[in-house]
């Protein structure tokens, strides 16, 4: 019998073992506070009955609620999978482990494509990683714990009767299986590359499936469980200088920077994303670069292990399931030759413009129920076509004005989630592991944006007393605002200082003119809402103001700014951008697209601050105006 727990609010869900074989005990806990639960209620169900509705609570999304379309958003994140199928896969990898024990020491074998439509990384499926099983013994899942419900996937801890734990990652079905397939295939191969070639500590991946036809009945990744604490526990971005926690602050910067240094340490031979070479047998060979992923490999086991294929950077795939993949998406996904780094920007713009055109056509044909205004989509087309048009001229790739330009343009591995929240320090050895590589790609360092945990685009203050006139005479509220700006500036400066220590040839990538030149592309990559195309326009207009200076200094390719903006265009942009800022300020939870952490949501609902409407949506009750 397997028992599992569904916790409320914090949603730490557990499935535990019992002596009654053949049944699952489902435990639903209503928590009053994150990680604090009341006494659970227990329900029993048979292990082999995957369709028992009693266990559905274990798979439901519980970490937050949405003000709009809450029911639909939660249904999109329902991650029901076959526990019995997971059990079979675990037994299969232990059988493979026994076979791997016969392989020569140090031999690195290629991934094995199994008959059940899963793929095993047999190099990792060895006794030292998963333990041993006695002859005729079967592996049995004894406990399932839902330990994290993230933006893109659900994380389950899997305990077995061998006292060995695993992690099962199930992506939310927010996109079609083709998108998930590319993403999983590339992420697994990239983690394998980071482990075997770059020497980065990552969880060992044992098995994965890219669609729902495997025994788990969901796309999944089965990997090593690492017990420890997230590095984020030690990160305080608003720490006072000289605080007793200064060493922790410095260590976080160092640990994340060291990961970045290893990620960019090897120059690659193309732009795109990393896949296993033997993915070629099931795909179109034209998708992959034929030449070696990098030069100079002497280990025969690593030669031809990986290839560069289409980029899985999230911005290229986000909200594009309605496009014809082969005709409308594939031409813009790469891979791109290393001689054409700016094609990444150009194709990003062209793909987004194609996406907006298709959405308009679908809306006009009556085949789309989305509520997006046609004007917004038309403005997006103009913006993204402008981005594509300016792409070849954004950087003069032959300039001598930017030191080490060719180093900055070389393909290097980019991790989009380089963050203390994505790093765990294991309990025993106190070693840091980089966890999630979803969306990783190869692109020039000059186009790689700073990690979000230290990114800051506001006014820079390096010294409160010197930079702020009469700082000591300001009100406490004014001082707090400037102190916030100073600390954000300091964090970014410390990150860039560590970059210079680790990779001095790449430091000019954070020079203000270079940041400004790549800012339209970064705004496109980081866009979260429909209206944020305006931030791309804003970056382009800022470039327009300084283009002549950049041209005089040989930073850009064209002497004249490549885009035309009329006075009316600029006035309309200023008005629309102001409306966007007002919307962000006046609309509760706009920054999270209406999502609210569940404990906060329940408190607001119980207090009457949030009111449920007849259609199932919620509104935030505005405070009454004082007379």
Swiss-Prot record:
Keyword annotations from UniProtKB, A to Z: Mitochondrion, Transit peptide
Cellular compartment(s): Mitochondrion
InterPro entries membership: Kinase-like_dom_sf, Mito_inheritance_9
Presequence range in chain numbering: 1-43
Keyword Transit peptide appears in the UniProt entry: yes
Coiled coil (residue ranges): none
Gene Ontology CC: mitochondrion
Family of this protein: Belongs to the AIM9 family.
Protein name, entry field: Altered inheritance of mitochondria protein 9, mitochondrial
């Amino acid at each position: 019998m397997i028992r599992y727990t569904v916790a409320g609010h914090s949603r730490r869900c557990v499935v535990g073992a019992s002596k009654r074989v053949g049944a699952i005990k489902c435990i639903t806990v209503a928590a009053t506070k994150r990680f604090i639960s009341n006494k659970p209620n227990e329900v029993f169900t048979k292990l082999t009955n995957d369709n028992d509705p009693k266990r559905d609570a274990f798979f439901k999304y519980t970490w937050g609620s949405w003000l709009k379309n809450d029911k639909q958003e939660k249904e999109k994140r329902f991650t029901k999978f076959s526990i019995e199928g997971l059990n079979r896969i675990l037994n299969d990898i232990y059988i493979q482990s026994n076979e791997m024990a016969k392989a020569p020491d140090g031999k690195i074998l290629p991934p094995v494509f199994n008959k059940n439509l899963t793929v095993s990384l047999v190099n990792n499926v060895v006794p030292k990683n998963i333990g041993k099983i006695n002859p005729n013994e079967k592996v049995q899942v004894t406990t399932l714990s839902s330990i994290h419900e993230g933006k893109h996937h659900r994380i389950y801890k899997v305990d077995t009767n061998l006292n060995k734990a695993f992690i099962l990652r199930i992506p939310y079905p927010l996109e079609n299986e083709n998108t998930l397939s590319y993403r999983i295939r590339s992420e697994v191969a990239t983690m394998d590359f980071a482990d075997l070639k770059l020497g980065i500590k990552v969880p060992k991946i044992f098995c994965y499936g890219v669609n729902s036809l495997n025994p788990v009945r969901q796309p999944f990744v089965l990997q090593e469980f690492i017990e420890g604490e997230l590095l984020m526990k030690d990160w305080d971005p608003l720490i006072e200088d000289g605080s007793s926690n200064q060493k922790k602050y410095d260590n976080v910067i160092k640990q994340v920077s060291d990961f970045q240094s290893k990620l960019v340490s090897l120059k690659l031979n193309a732009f795109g994303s990393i896949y296993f070479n033997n993915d070629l047998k099931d795909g179109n060979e034209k998708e992959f670069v034929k030449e070696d992923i990098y030069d100079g490999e002497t280990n025969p086991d690593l030669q031809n292990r990986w290839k560069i294929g289409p980029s899985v950077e999230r911005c290229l795939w986000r909200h594009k399931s309605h496009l014809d993949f082969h005709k409308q998406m594939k031409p813009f996904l790469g891979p791109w030759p290393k001689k054409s780094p700016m094609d990444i920007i150009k194709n990003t713009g062209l793909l987004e413009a194609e996406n907006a055109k298709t959405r308009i056509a679908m809306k006009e044909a009556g085949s789309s129920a989305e509520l997006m205004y046609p004007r917004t989509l038309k403005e997006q087309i103009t913006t993204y076509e402008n981005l594509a048009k300016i792409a070849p001229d954004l950087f003069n790739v032959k300039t001598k004005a930017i030191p080490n330009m060719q180093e900055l343009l070389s393909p290097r591995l980019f991790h989009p989630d380089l963050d203390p929240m994505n790093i765990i320090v294991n309990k025993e050895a106190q070693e840091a592991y980089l966890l999630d590589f979803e969306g990783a790609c190869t692109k020039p360092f000059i186009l790689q944006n700073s990690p979000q945990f230290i990114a800051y685009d506001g006014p820079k203050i390096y010294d409160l007393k010197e930079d702020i006139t009469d700082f000591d005479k300001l009100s406490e509220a004014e001082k707090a605002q400037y102190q916030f700006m100073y600390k954000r500036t300091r964090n970014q400066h410390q990150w860039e200082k560590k970059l210079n220590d680790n990779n001095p040839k790449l430091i000019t990538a954070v020079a203000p003119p270079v940041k400004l030149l790549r800012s339209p592309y970064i705004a496109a990559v980081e866009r979260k809402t429909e209206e944020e195309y305006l931030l791309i326009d804003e970056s382009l207009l800022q470039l327009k103001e300084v283009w002549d200076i950049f041209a005089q200094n040989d930073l850009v390719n064209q002497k004249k700014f490549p885009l035309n903006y009329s006075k009316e265009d600029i006035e309309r942009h200023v008005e629309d951008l102001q409306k966007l800022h007002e919307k962000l300020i006046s609309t509760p939870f706009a920054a999270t697209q209406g999502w609210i952490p569940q404990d906060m949501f329940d408190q607001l609902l119980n207090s009457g601050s949030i009111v449920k409407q007849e259609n199932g949506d919620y509104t935030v009750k505005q405070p009454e105006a004082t007379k």
